[in-house]
Design a protein with these regions (language model features):
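Beta-strand/loop substructures that line and gate deep hydrophobic ligand-binding cavities in soluble
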Residues: 33-81
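Residue-identity detector for threonine
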Residues: 5, 19, 39, 53, ...
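Short beta-edge strand/loop motif at the mouth of beta-sheet-based domains
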Residues: 1-17, 24-26, 97-108
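Short, solvent-exposed loop/turn segments at secondary-structure junctions
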Residues: 10, 28, 63-65
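Beta-strand residues in well-ordered beta-sheet regions across diverse protein folds
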Residues: 4, 28-30, 56-58
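Short, exposed beta-strand/loop patches in secreted or surface proteins that constitute
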Residues: 18-20, 46
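Short, conserved beta-turn/loop elements at beta-strand boundaries and strand-helix junctions
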Residues: 22-27, 50
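A conserved amphipathic terminal alpha-helix motif
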Residues: 61-112
Length: 112
């Protein structure tokens, strides 16, 4: 299955190829890392009890260059932010991304 997603801080569509979905257990996708190759993202979900779930995200397939290492660290920060936003949404019903970025510039409000 192919979908396209976007992010306020990185305007434009990002094509994503979903390669595997195991309900309540795992999602695997591939998307372009830049420079004409894809990375593989694996999201794993493990129940830790009635109200707790451990979520692990890994992204593999990066080339070894400073540019690609920088991109991988940027994506790591993005995945961390996404998980924090999801946790607050699930537990408190608050959308942390709403108002976080100016949709015209992709930057936090007031940033130069």
């Amino acid at each position: 299955m192919r979908i396209a997603t976007g992010f306020a801080d990185f305007p434009g569509a990002f094509p994503v190829k979903v390669t595997k979905v195991e309900p309540n257990r795992r999602i695997v996708l591939e998307w372009e890392a830049g420079e004409g190759y894809d990375t593989r993202v694996e999201m794993e979900f493990e129940s830790l009890g009635k109200d707790d779930t451990l979520v692990k995200i890994s992204e593999s397939g990066w080339r070894v260059s400073q540019k690609d290492l920088d991109r991988s660290y940027g994506n790591c920060m993005g995945w961390t932010q996404m998980l924090c936003c999801c946790k607050v949404w699930v537990e408190h019903g608050l959308n942390l991304r709403e108002g976080f970025f100016d949709t015209r510039t992709g930057k936090p409000p007031g940033a130069e």
